[in-house]
Amino acid sequence: MKKVIFLSMLLVFCMLAYGQTYRIEGTVIDKTSRKPLEFVNVLVVGLGIGSSTDAEGHFSVEQVPPGIYRLQASMLGYKTVFTSEYRVNHRTPHIQIEMEEEGTQLEGVTVTASPFQKVAESPVSLRVIGLQEIEKAPGANRDISRVVQNYPGVAFSPIGYRNDLIVRGGGPSENRFYLDGVEIPNINHFSTQGASGGPVGLIDADLIRNVKFYSGAFPANRGNALSSVLDFSLRDGDMEHNSLKATLGASEVALTSNGHLGDKTSYLVSVRQSYLQMLFKVLGLPLLPAYTDASFKLKTRFDARNELTLLGLGGIDRMKLNFDIEGEDAEYILGYLPKINQETFTLGGVYRHYAGPHVQSVTLSHSYLNNRNLKYHDNDESSEDNLTLRLRSVEQETKLRMENTSTWNLWKLNAGVELNYSQYSNTTYQRVFTDEVQIFDYRTNLDIFRWGLFASMDYSAPDERFTASLGVRTDGNNYNDKMKELWRQLSPRLSVSYRLIDRLFLSGHMGLYYQLPPYTALGFKGNDGSYLNRNLDYISVSQESVGLSWQPNENMEISAEGFYKFYRDMPLSVSDGIPLACKGNDYGVIGNERLISTAEGRSYGIEMMFKWLLVQRLNLSSSLTIFKSEFRDGKEGDYVPSAWDNRFIFNVSGTYNFPKNWSVGMKISCIGGSLYTPYDVEKSSLVEAWNAQGKAYYDYDRYNTERLPAFGQLDIRVDKMFYWKKCMFGVYLDIQNITASKLRQPDVLMSTGQIENPTAPLSERRYVMKSIKQESGTLLPALGITFEY
């Protein structure tokens, strides 16, 4: 009887949810004058329903089924606009659409609009990631760093181990991130200091509207990047309603709120707490991570021409070691992994003034990172003699950017200035073994003042058949005399695009980009208190790319792009002869060593992508990247494969929406085998060497001479949504590596703890060594639940 009652209630529950429809409301304004536009046709893309705006620019579309949609706005004399994606439910936000007047229109010429965004400054190497992909990408668990890995040129960490962004053969330290124009230093918990990767994303997907992902052709107002820029656009709070959403994700629980404070200010706020520590303990893993994060956005529109956005993002990370488990694998990891504690936050504000064809903005922000690592030999904290690493490092940056954008008919000019004051402090005790044991014991207090200028001019032909963009940027700082000279870091760039025939575009870009080495390198000291890396230069990369893109219809795009990157003045490690760019894909810190700017590198290849979008039905994409990544020591050295030289990356990802709000997604990922370096058995077996770092040393004379097999995995995701008049409930099942594919890794060399020659002098004593077979690859299921009221 209980089963009958339960099934009856479930049936009624589903029937009430099915067939629910909603209303979409918003306003359309002139982008320049900020005045409302009347008689604009607004359509829900893919549904064929819509409405027109009234004298106040207001529109309302009734009877819209729940889901994720774009809007299309069109009007004679204005460029047709496709909006970002919006979720339509009981709390669909008020949507504001900005339309731009068309320039001088040639008689008889029709300009065809498309949802696939192309901009004059970045006609190649730019992808816009929408809400559908962020919410439902299989295997990503709503983590934007993993969503990006579906795109051409981006390598991925098998079995979802880490979120390092490896773009077009570049290192994980070569990326920059922006939230609504505010730069943030990293987007991951437990981030590797000196790089950008980590195991879990820091940004709650519930706050994201879309992401612009640049794998090249960076805008002039986005500096200090060599491989990629991720430009996040956050949602605005709802000016009509207040709502609350709870989410149980793969690794955390989250609570988000969205609404308004008065009639001029909207807000978004999110708080998340992980339960990984409990989960990892149950699974018997040797590390116990826990994290908390919070983020917010406040936006105030004072009037039609002035607005202020305040936002914040912060995280607290704690990683303990689990000594309650046994086994050789656990023994190995516990032997070298330090305890890690991190706190990070960014607070920023953007003031924007609209003055007709001119828009001025002022962006002010402050970022903070406090990173602490602690390690004792054999994890024995009973004596300070066992201490091998104690690090406390703090990075702080205060940034000011002022810019103006002016539009005149077919031309657009953007220009501005940046100022940056950075403080870096470090207290380090570290035991290191080269040919003998060395102790680095130093304190750093480094202040760096940075400045930059940028400008770009865009042109678009009246029929939009041809576009061009010319930009320049230059940066400097007071770290050393060479870096002060702006002309040394002059960074020109040029982009062009030409429509060969209807919907077929040929585009190209060339540019020179610069990036400052990490603070960990700039602040590294010797025991005598002197800065050992004072002669470092800015790292530079010249990039060239050319691409073809074809849009058979408004729902489909096929593209191919070739790229070439050449690096100069790459920091090279004095101790092992490896560029800093080849490090940073593991926990800890990189850059805190003696470096010289003598390495060069190159990466080149071809990317192909197919994308097919059918609103509320299908989101399908496929990408293939074939590339090579190499470096050398100086102009006369031989090229050696870099750590990121996987040779190929292949992805197919799709999500299909079934009736009654069911959706199923699948992703197939394949990547070429990673290179690895054999161990230096002689050095690793020395007692003093092993005790210094707790793991084996590589034989860098044979750097990257071995390659692992290629790897592939299949991820599946199933979603079910329930919609009612005043609330929404959703559940999803995400399964990574559903076929349990095995990832082959090099055998690990480790000490048995037994000394084979105990009577020898200490410097000659050796451990008896053993090898542990390394192979991972398990099915990783995750259940997620969301409820919004």
Predicted stretch roles:
Residues N188, D324-D329, S425-V432, D502-E544, ...:
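Surface-exposed extracellular loop regions of Gram-negative outer-membrane beta-barrel proteins
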Residues L276, E307-Y354, Q360, Y368-E395, ...:
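Flexible loop and strand-edge segments within Gram-negative outer membrane beta-barrel domains
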Residues L391-S393, E397-E403, D441-F454, N533, ...:
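Outer membrane beta-barrel strand-and-loop segments of large Gram-negative receptors
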Residues R568, L620, C670-G694, P709-Q713, ...:
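C-terminal beta-signal and adjacent terminal beta-strands/loops
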